[in-house]
Amino acid sequence: MAERANLFFHNKVIDGTAIKRIISRFIDHFGMAYTSHILDQVKTLGFHQATATSISLGIDDLLTIPSKGWLVQDAEQQSLILEKHHHYGNVHAIEKLRQSIEIWYATSEYLRQEMNPNFRMTEPFNPVHIMSFSGARGNASQVHQLVGMRGLMSDPQGQMIDLPIQSNLREGLSLTEYIISCYGARKGVVDTAVRTSDAGYLTRRLVEVVQHIVVRRTDCGTTRGISVSSRNGMIPERIFIQTLIGRVLADNIYMGLRCIATRNQDIGIGLVNRFITFRTQPISIRTPFTCRSTSWICRLCYGRSPTHGDLVELGEAVGIIAGQSIGEPGTQLTLRTFHTGGVFTGGTAEHVRAPSNGKIKFNKGLVHPTRTRHGHPAFLCSMDLYVTIESQDIIHNVTIPPKSFLLVQNDQYVESEQVIAEIRSGTYTLNFTERVRKHIYSDSEGEMHWSTDVYHASEFTYSNVHLLPKTSHLWILSGGSCRSSIVPFSLHKDQDQINVHSLSVERGYISNPSENNDKVKHKFFSSYLSSKSKKKSRILDYSDLNRIICTGFIYPTILHENSDLLAKRRKNRFIIPFQSIQEKELMSHSDILIEIPINGIFRRNSIFAYFDDPQYRRKSSGITKYVAIGVHSIVKKEDLVEYRGVKEFQPKYQMKVDRFFFIPEEVYILPESSSLMVRNNSIIGVDTQITLNTKSRVGGLIRIERKKKKMELKIFSGDIHFPRATDKISRYSGILIPPGTVKTNSKESKKVKNWIYVQRITPTKKKSFVLVRPVLIYERGDGINLERLFPPDLLQEKENLKLRIVNYILYGNGKPIQGISNTSIQLVRTCLVLNWNQDKKSSSIEEARVYFVEVSINGLIRDFLRIHLGKSRISYISRKRNDPSGLGLISDNGPDRTNINPFYSIYSKTRIPQSLKQNQGTISISTLLNRNMECQSLIILSSSNCFRMDPSNGVKSYNVIKESTKRDPIIPIRNLLGPLGTTLQIANFYSFYHLLTHNQISVIKYLKLDNLKLKQTSKVLKYYLMDENGRIVNHDPYSNNVLNPFKLNWYFLHHNYHHNYCEETFTIINLGQFICENVCMTKNGPRLKSGQVLIVHADSVILRLAKPYLATPGATVHGHYGEILYEGDTLVTFIYEKSRSGDITQGLPKVEQVLEVRSIDSISINLEKRVENWNECITRIVGIPWGFLIGAELTIVQSRISLVNKIQKVYRSQGVQIHNRHIEIIVRQITSKVLVSEDGMSNVFSPGELIGLLRAERAMRALEEAICYRTVFLGITRASLSTQSFISEASFQETARVLAKAALRGRIDWLKGLKENVVLGGMIPVGTGFKGLAHRSSQHKIIPFKIKKKNLFAGEMRDILFHHRELFDSCISKNFYNISEQSFIGFNDS
């Protein structure tokens, strides 16, 4: 009893790990037999207790953690703020994803940590709680899912799903959560089965590689070791102890002068504790890596056996044990299909918190600003940073380690427990990371702009791949785009030189919205096909069109510096290239000609433009026939038409007939002297020779007429009929017959499908006959009405101007039309006739002035057509065309006419179909320069895309203007607004042409060269301004609005004030500036929307809505500046590193990747570079032979340690403990081969041969010459196929190939491993009893040692060739163990 009183009593819970420790202590202390008795008693005790407790599990035992509600709420709040920041453009998509995952991961972890204390306090014997750490059933993670929250899931690829499951299994999941949990769960039968088979196959390959590794000797005599040190704190103590226990020291350990451990001593727990206490120098230990043998291992390099705690015995098959101990946990762990969501295996970063309230101070020189991986601004410390926090009575000092983020600013007031810094976690570098591409897609359609310079890699100059050099925003400016459904136009003048590429414009189909008005949502231009629809849809109220201003459909030629656009004005005719697709057939090219009289004055009813429809164009000659209803010329004087240099007078006939007929014929005009090869009234076929150098293009009847000095030869195609009686012929001469039945004689009648023309021909001698000729019918409705091109209210000035569309035939009824060779004949011309109302005001106006105005913006020259009623003086400003200011016209209109819109581009006023009412808005044309192809489209800026913000009285500028108005009341406030767009190249604003100038002067040059006072410049500059209604207002001469091109602000100047004073008026908002949402513009609070400033008003700002996307350096931007993107287009691609999920089911593929040495980024980036650099440096320093040796050695050592760490990391993250030596044995096998390289050919090995590293070293020593080789990592599969035994290889994979190769090479298998002997049914050469078996015969013991000495070199050579140290004796006799070990070692080391 006295003894029992002295015993300690421990009142502690013993879990699985504690029991393991106790057992190992028992074994150390009492030995195996005694321990097993104790454990039996513990087992019985356990069963008794379990029976007495009778634990059962009910649903009431699942108690939810009380703090869950507010933790989840807090996380949701953080996510909401994050979402806002992303919307404002402060954080990009990846930072948002990372941060949201970390928020939820942290929440889930807090809940998990709360779980155990909660159970301990409320119900310590809760069965769920007991199970959670018993180790037998489940673990804390599973219980956490039952009573905490299920948390983040990852999909089958191991990617995180950023929507967490907030419920736990006790509460039940919502439908969405259930689907996510199915998607991320690993409970699928197939999944488990597949993964189990994977793990099994991994085990098989591992065993295959190392099955022949057996402990054959006690000591290989190596002096090398691997040093392990816990001094720098890189290795946690637990792992340090695990690494050391059971190993053998490679060197003596000294403490000062005293030796505390000797070489070849094995390390127990006592020795490890002594090392930790004394903090000795790095400890050098022996590992399987350092063993000098090739195909076996010695006892000291292996260390203690895990089974009994002593040195491993000879004959132990340690290879197979190693393979199984790595593969088996995988097999077991695939069955643990729960998913912990532990993507961030490194955990969240540690935080440094302020100890008390106070002001923080640090040295600014030691930090530099950066962004954290969550997108927050922070300072990065490059070295240890000392931070002081001064509160009222005490000063705290905090040291922040290097590479940490400081989250506060200097002199900032911090509160107690506020996070002031974030320390990167130590395991950060060991994480499995992978580089991932993430594409960001556009949410809305619009136009792309960026706010920084962009790198164009030289090979990508014309492509749309751009790299961002610094963090910046990409903006998508809103606006629906619309392909013009009408033909694209150009107002290039006749004979202008144009870029070739500028004509390659996408052509849209012409649709008819009057039929399907509701369906055509995105066709912008309507085509009016009938005059009825024109009347119905007339716009009576001009205000409907207010916002639809388009600045001219011009092919935008982007003028490069070296190309001048030259114009030769000839006869004042302007050509609009026109091409349409009709019936999916490309018509031939045709132009719209706008003829403007040289004096620029149009009378009433004069033809303003005409268009030759290609449908009415014929290659052949012929006759037109129609029923004349009323034919009169439009303009009384006949116009001079210039036709291929031949001037002809052509009257223009207007016709009101529905159709006309064209009878084709072929006409040849030949000189009188030419010799004909055909006769008159003969019938010929196609391609008949008519004269020596002409052939007929059609077949038919020939008629020859001789005139003065020339012959006219006509070929009529058609059928010939010989009627019987002459009286019937008279009916059929020179008339058109409609489709129907034609009686040729009484007996037979012929059905005619088409119109025919019947002509009577009477030859002189022969019988007369009738020629029936085919007829081409032209319906009037066939052609393209110019109404489609010019909508009804096109050029109206208010309601005055009228356009009438007139078709007329160029040739009279029945007149023969003769074509000049190889040119086509235009039969019908469509004209646009200009007219205007004769109301009281304008009755006196008999003429309209028309002129072009050219506006040059960013080197693009835009032409506008202006039609002006009333008398006005026009003066030309002559400039060179290549001058960027362009050619301008000044109209001296007084201020009384400001309300009349001065600019009407021909194509700028267009009617929008009713269905597009909601899309009314300003139109801007953007130019896409896309791989040498320019394509033009429109953007409709509707009122929904514009946002107007009224700053209230808080704005400084507003007050200034008010004051100035009192002093100088002439300034009307309504004119203090400016549209966006200037003569400047401001970041290539291709799309904003709203500044319409009618006196274009190169402002930049003036301001730069002359430095004129702004007051003078303001007189030179005259702008048309566009107000918020889209109306264009003439410049008001009383207000001096000056656009300062340098700051791009609008300044309001008076004569009274000095320039500097006014500079302060509007410094807040610049035109064209991008404003993010939530930016404070006024004192009264934040703005509501993000966008680009379009118009600055005196008391308000008009923005074009835009969506910002943040992009960090290195991101790839797709698309060009100013390009139009549609919803869902790829905008940016980010490349970022993310840590891979660390659960074992995804860990197994990782282990496999490492062992198969597949190049995954995380390995190859480091190792390949290391190998290359080492090889280069070392050969330079040491010289070639030693260089290869040392380089290969170092590479291999470094790589081996790296591989072991990677594999251990996966298993440790799952709480699986595998001793390093198992992994080392396998890694040693896959890294012990080198590849003989081709430079420096050696006599022994052929290039490309795989040989063992040790064998190569021995060969170099023996031959005393360099063998060039490089290190190779074989994967476990390749290593299994390149062993010394072909039987083992053939039984693994590719049996036929392996056996065939072995036969050809005459390979010998010495049956050294287990597998070969199993295959052949022999005795397995392993096992602890094997040594006794080998020692049976002793007759060879007497081989004298000196014989060996004599024959040293031969033995060495054989050793090299067979590359087995124990090989050459075993072939003579089975018992090579009889040779004394000493002689063996002596021989090898000599």
UniProtKB/Swiss-Prot annotation:
A Pfam family per the record: RNA_pol_Rpb1_4
EC number: 2.7.7.6
CDD domains: RNAP_beta'_C
Broad enzyme group: transferase
UniProt entry keywords in alphabetical sequence: Chloroplast, DNA-directed RNA polymerase, Metal-binding, Nucleotidyltransferase, Plastid, Transcription, Transferase, Zinc
Catalytic activity: RNA(n) + a ribonucleoside 5'-triphosphate = RNA(n+1) + diphosphate
Alphabetized InterPro entries for the sequence: DNA-dir_RpoC2_beta_pp, RNA_pol_beta''_euk, RNA_pol_Rpb1_3_sf, RNA_pol_Rpb1_4, RNA_pol_Rpb1_5, Rpb1_funnel_sf
One GO MF term: zinc ion binding
Entry's family note: Belongs to the RNA polymerase beta' chain family. RpoC2 subfamily.
Biological function: DNA-dependent RNA polymerase catalyzes the transcription of DNA into RNA using the four ribonucleoside triphosphates as substrates.
Name recorded for this polypeptide: DNA-directed RNA polymerase subunit beta''
